[in-house]
Amino acid sequence: MLEVGNAYEIEFSFTQEQVNDFCKISGDFNPLHWDEAYAATTPFKKPIIHGALIASVFSRVMGMEFPGEGSVYLKQVSEFKRPLFVGITYKAKFEIVSTNPAKHTAEISTQVFDLERGKLMVDGIASAMHTALF
């Protein structure tokens, strides 16, 4: 059984090729994500990673690692505090903040940090159900 306070961390990064693939999969071809010349005219100065692609890390972890296989990812609320860029290693942190054993659910803090700068990039909360673990 997983309990309040149990935590998990994973490091990740994305390549421009992965971002371009996500453009195709999602249909979001906003030049802010792939066009260096366009992005240079924005406050970000270079292409940024789609928020939904960043959130895919949460989906991967929730479904495969923590809580893992058999879990149902019910909800995600995320605040994107700073832009994320390709080629930078980030750390995603997960921590169980509450459980409801009667419903086999948990609320899990989901955060992304820039390892180099130590800054919080994404702050969120997720809900998951797992009949064997909560």
Regions found by a protein language model. Name each.
Residues 1-71:
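Hot-dog-fold acyl-thioester-processing enzymes
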Residues 1-7, 84-134:
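HotDog/MaoC-like acyl-thioester-processing domains
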Residues 64-92:
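Mid-chain, well-packed structural core segment of small domains
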Residues 10-14, 78, 126-128:
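Generic detection of short hydrophobic beta-strand segments and adjacent strand-loop junctions
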Residues 16-18, 76, 111:
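Residue-identity detector for glutamine
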